[in-house]
Regions:
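N-terminal, membrane-interfacial amphipathic/helix-forming hydrophobic leader that caps
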Residues: 1-73, 242-285
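Alpha-helical transmembrane segments and their helix-start/interface "positive-inside/aromatic belt" motifs
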Residues: 5-22, 77-93, 214-218
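Residue-level signature of transmembrane alpha-helical entry/exit and packing/kink sites
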Residues: 10-18, 45, 49-53, 57, ...
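Membrane-helix interface motif
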Residues: 27-40, 104-111, 233-236
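Membrane-interface helix termini and inter-helical loops of multi-pass transporters
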Residues: 37-44, 77-78, 107-117, 182-188, ...
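Juxtamembrane helix-loop-helix connectors linking adjacent transmembrane helices
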Residues: 44-53, 76-138, 148-158
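Juxtamembrane interface elements at the cytosolic ends of transmembrane helices
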Residues: 62-77, 105, 138-142
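Transmembrane helix-loop-helix hairpins at the membrane interface
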Residues: 125-285
Length: 285
């Protein structure tokens, strides 16, 4: 399929944004993290250690914001699309419910965290709610939105084959930065978190192109990370916080994969229902 010169220029810009942002993420973000870790607050306190883990993502989001503004004269939120806050909150709530019900059964030895007081738990609840927003938004843009724009710079509806190809690429792309994560390197069953990461990348891309918006995908990503950090298994992830509960087991159950599939299925059915209802209302009108 032939594309216009304007689309070719846009593709080159998207590629440059992706490359420069990733370079800034790993170089400037990494160096800033190392500098901050030399300070007592960021190296000795649990709050500081938790905050500093988000620094590379904040740098990444800053790069993305400036580059998109310079290259396309538009806000970063335009890339995400969607209907806004209601769509985000609804999807996040659905994901939290599905994840909360199913993933709890996939964990091993769940122990109540009685070390930290409720004040510290509340602090981490607020920190998680705030810091996970830029973290997950930056990852959605880099791992889902920019690859789609590079493959289809004219924003036409992707065919089935190209959509699956894009999703497969996004799945592999999403796995790569997580290869050194604690849940992969220290687990006796690393294949389960790796498959889960691939499914998140693959299914997120399919959902985003299906509903023509990445707001639901961003919301699912946010809700899943929020659940993992605040409620359970934060002890063995890179985002160590002060969860209400934590899982002492170093093994991951295959139910984690089932949880991922179920969450995407429920959200997809929800948006399919919404789409049919809107079509019916527009037809009646």
């Amino acid at each position: 399929m032939r594309i216009s010169e304007e689309a070719k220029t846009a593709r080159i810009r998207y590629i440059l944004i992706l490359v420069i942002s990733l370079a800034g993420w790993f170089s400037l973000g990494g160096m800033l993290t190392l500098v901050l870790k030399r300070l007592p607050f960021f190296s000795e306190t649990k709050t500081g250690i938790f905050i500093v883990t988000f620094v590379p993502h904040l740098v990444l989001l800053l790069f993305l914001t400036l580059l998109v503004r310079y290259a396309f004269r538009e806000k970063l939120t335009v890339l995400v699309g969607g209907k806004g806050t209601r769509e985000f909150l609804t999807t996040a709530l659905i994901t939290l419910v599905v994840t909360g019900i199913t993933e709890t059964f996939s964990l091993g030895n769940i122990v109540y965290n009685s070390t930290d007081g409720w004040g510290e738990k509340a602090l981490f609840l607020v920190l998680s709610a705030v810091l996970l927003l830029p973290q997950t938004l930056a990852e959605e843009i880099v791992f889902r939105i920019l690859p789609e724009r590079i493959l289809s710079p004219e924003e036409r509806n992707l065919g089935r084959c190209r959509r699956i190809l894009l999703a497969f690429f996004c799945g592999i792309f999403f796995v790569l930065p997580h290869l050194l994560n604690t849940e992969v390197t220290s687990s006796s069953t690393p294949v389960i978190p790796l498959v889960t990461y691939f499914l998140w990348g693959f299914l997120s891309s399919l959902l985003g192109t299906y509903v023509h918006s990445y707001v639901p995908v961003w919301a699912m990503h946010y809700a899943n990370n929020f659940f993992s950090v605040v409620i359970v298994s934060a002890e063995k992830t890179t985002l160590t916080g002060a969860p209400l509960f934590y899982d002492k087991s170093e093994e991951y159950s295959p139910l984690l994969i089932v949880t991922t599939l179920l969450a995407f299925l429920v959200v997809s059915l929800f948006f399919r229902h919404i789409g049919k209802r809107e079509d019916k209302e527009s037809f009646s009108g």
